[in-house]
Amino acid sequence: MTQLKIFLISLAVFFIPFIIPGFRNVNSLIIQSEDTVPSIFTTISIIKDQTLYLDKYYVMMRDRYPHPDDKDFQKDLTPFYLRKIDGHYITAFPIVTSIISIPVFILPVIFNMPLTWDNLALLGHLSGALIMALAGLFMFKTLREGFDLEEKKSKILTAVFLFATVNFAMLSQAMWQHGTLQLLSILGIYFFLKHQKNPNAYINMLFSGLFFGFAFLSRPTAGLPILLIELYLIFTNLHKIDNLFKSATTFTSGLFIAASFFFWYNSVFYYDIQNQGYSDQLFGSWLSPFPVSFLGVWLSPSKGILIFSPVFIFSIYGLYLAVKNKIDKAGLYKIFAVIILLHTLVISLWKHWYGGWSFGYRMSGDVLPYFIFLMIPYINSVYFEKTKKLFFVLFGLSVFIEIYGLLFFDGIWHAAYDLGFENTSWLWSIKDSQFLFDIRRVLVKLGLMASACPKCL
């Protein structure tokens, strides 16, 4: 019953504001990013046309969301979120989110729902909310059953995961790949921990590998946890060679099933792995001004992890306690910390480490479950009782920031200040930060200021 309540409450909190007219009057952005547009149409195409090709919907997508360099359609550039292969248009992004969203779309599509942008946004929003609500449900199950955390504390950390992070303002609001990756990664960890408790139940390692494999198909950044979890498995089972061999084999078998699916649809629809959307970014997109970009991932006034979710300070403290006190699963907590560190390091090297036109630290959303897991040593310690007030203050502040993002993220701040990846000084300005810009927007509406962007006049 508790799990059902968590699922239903989170789904309602994520989805209901979108259908309230008053909310739409405050934030009229119905689809957060064109990155999520092909996922919507891929789901429709799978159901309606039994294909991944988006030829029927290309004009509709291009007219609403053209390539940034082709706004007048004079060059007819294929939008960056699509690929043109052998005369067919296909999504440039992974398709796992589209597949998971089929249950949401199937009845409206079968009954010929009109393909208007409002209808599509509604279904896309419901899909994003549903995926994140499921992620919250399995986060709670993992905390309770995998880490043996008591119910009250599991609810607190699940609430942090759902509402004090970009999961609230961003990833639950559209068909982002990040939400799918989180759901599948949590399931991978859940079954891995079940195997740790019952080493002879190798089916759990098969499921762990399967879910981690599909997480990787959702976003390539999920490859880091796979490698590190496997290394942890090896080094903690060297004294049990037979068990280690069977565990590693079943885990790898799960990965193989996911890989087989990828190679099948890649050969049928993409023909060559080089036609996959991320392939052309593999060698030419590592252009960030490191280490400034790495500091930006964590501390940028308009994008930093610790700025938008200051409650994560307790994740860092949790790691410290795990290492200092050598608690149960201390090695696993170290692995979680390395996953976060390597992910933020890799992202900081990529030219769009700040996530393009998005709210907060979207690009680091992939590792949010590991931030939550690192809070376990803290919330289980005597220091939680001593610092409980500070924890809930930062928790509340983090939730407030997400509600603010839900209301104010509409791309206007980016339109006013975004200088692209070649000059990232705009990401460090406090005076022109997204927070202060939006305060000025409110003052303009109240007639107390002439413009929210004085330099734009």
Could you say what each language-model-derived stretch is?
Residues 1-24, 31, 124, 144-145, ...:
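Start-transfer (signal-anchor) and selected internal transmembrane alpha helices
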Residues 13-14, 154-165, 190, 212-216, ...:
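Short helix- or helix-capping micro-motifs
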Residues 113-118, 136-164, 183, 199-203, ...:
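Transmembrane-helix signature of polytopic, membrane-embedded enzymes
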Residues 122-148, 186-191:
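Transmembrane-helix motifs of polytopic, lipid-linked glycan transferases
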Residues 180-198, 203-212, 226-232, 370-374:
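Specific aromatic-rich, kink-prone transmembrane helix
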Residues 197, 224-256, 316-329, 373:
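Perimembrane helix-loop-helix junctions
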Residues 228, 245-320, 335-347, 368, ...:
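Membrane-lumen/periplasm interface segments of specific transmembrane helices
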Residues 234, 307-330, 334-337, 371-378, ...:
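Hydrophobic, aromatic-rich transmembrane alpha-helices
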